[in-house]
Amino acid sequence: MKNKEIELKFIINEDIKNKLINEINKLGKLVGESHLIDTYYIPNFKDFEINGETIECIRIRETEKGVVLAYKKIHKEAKPIYCDEFETIVSSKEQMENILFSLGFSVQMIIDKSRASYKYNNLEFDLDSVKNLGELMEVELKNENGKIEEIYSFVSKFGLSQKDVTYEGIQNLMKKSLTK
């Protein structure tokens, strides 16, 4: 079972977002739109951060389709950065939270975002409008034999390059945004 995720994240402006939407309507396919509420939890018995940057996270995601529990371990030492990701559907957010709280976890933050998801060749990408943060684009390589250059080739059509990638997770971006 493959649980390795290779994706690049870009902070984008409204112009790039509109250009992307116009172009992808010609080249790719809109997979769907959704509203996501992501609640992140931190344990009181282990540090999920190194030097203030998140390297592990537990998240409960609420969508129109249901509730999903996820664990991610970010490998920042790797090039490109990737993470191990494990997800499972849960029937009750409240019960899952009770389990996490009983194990010594507390809520770190809640992130509210609207997402439009697209497919283009071997790529899947999401355009997110994140409350209190702004616009983000995540591009994920779906072919394990694919090369990260496929992502750079795609984003270059919109004036983005390797220098525009943010290696910070959404939790770190949100923390910085809220402290401004």
Language model segments and positions:
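N-terminal strand-loop-strand beta-hairpin
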Residues: M1-N122, L160-K180
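Mixed-charge, glycine-accented linear interaction segment located at domain edges/termini
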Residues: E144-G169
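Short beta->alpha junction loops/turns
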Residues: N13, K142-E144
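Strongly charged, low-complexity linkers/loops
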Residues: E124-V130, E135-L136
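A short local loop/turn or secondary-structure capping micro-motif enriched for an aromatic residue
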Residues: K76-K79, G134-L136, G146
